[in-house]
Structure formats: C-alpha cells, structure tokens
C-alpha cells in the first residue's frame, strides 16, 4: 500500500513538473528567434544603444519606456497622446495589431499574425538594455 502511494505521488509530481515546463515554454518567447524576426523591423528601426532613429524610433531600451518619448523623433499625435508605457503585454498587442492599439499611428505595418513570433520578438526586445 505504501509503495503504491509513493508511486502515485511520484507520477503525480512528474506530471506537474512536465506541465509547469510546458506552460513556461508556451508563455515566453525565444529571443534568438526574435532577433531573426527583427530583421524585418530593422528596415525602419535601429536597435543599438546610441544609434540614430530611422524611419521609426530606435527600439533599444523600449521595454519600460513611455511611448513617444525619444527626443527628436517625429511621432504621430496619436502616439504622443497614447499614454502607453511599453510593457511586455502592450508590445505584444501593438506588434500584433498596431492600428488597433494606437489608431492613427504612423507605422506602416499591418502587424504580426503569428502569436509565437510576437512572443519571440518581445523576448528579443527585452534583451535590448
């Protein structure tokens, strides 16, 4: 009886551990893949400390930054008035559907439909510190 209880406990713990690992993997993005996806973003955005803005603002340090806050960049009135602080959730939503999150912004990009690619991009942006 005790042996059966130990076996059941071990199986239950193994199942919980496997579920926790799977949930963690789904919840986060892969920064290395995100860096690869960023090549599309790099057409308009720089990503290095001190690099000049391009058509879009430099995204170095974007996580935690207030939207429309880089001095000297010509933001749309909509972006300036948005009041957004770029958290992980806000970045995910914006990358997926920019015009839905900030209607009237100037970014000429429809968004990324693949949720995993969005997660990967945000994971990469989080490394830019």
Task: Name each region found by the language model.
Residues 1-12:
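Bacterial N-terminal signal peptides that target proteins for export
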Residues 20-24:
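N-terminal signal peptide c-region/cleavage motif recognized by signal peptidases
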Residues 29-74, 80-85, 97-103, 127-129:
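Periplasmic/extracellular electron-transfer cofactor-ligation site
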Residues 5, 32-34, 89:
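Generic cytosolic/nucleocytoplasmic N-terminal low-complexity/intrinsically disordered segments
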Residues 8-10, 27, 51:
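Intrinsically disordered and other compositionally biased segments
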Residues 85-129:
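C-terminal capping alpha-helices of c-type cytochrome domains
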């Amino acid at each position: 009886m005790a042996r059966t209880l130990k076996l059941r406990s071990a199986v239950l713990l193994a199942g919980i551990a496997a579920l926790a690992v799977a949930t963690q993997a789904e919840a986060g993005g892969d920064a290395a893949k995100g860096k690869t996806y960023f090549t599309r973003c790099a057409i308009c955005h720089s990503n290095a400390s001190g690099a000049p803005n391009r058509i879009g603002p430099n995204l170095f340090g974007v996580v935690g930054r207030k939207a429309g806050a880089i001095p000297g960049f010509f933001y749309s009135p909509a972006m300036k008035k948005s009041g957004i602080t770029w958290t992980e959730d806000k970045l995910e939503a914006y990358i997926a559907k920019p015009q839905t999150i900030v209607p009237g912004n100037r970014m000429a990009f429809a968004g990324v439909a693949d949720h995993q690619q969005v997660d990967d991009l945000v994971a990469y942006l989080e490394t830019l510190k």
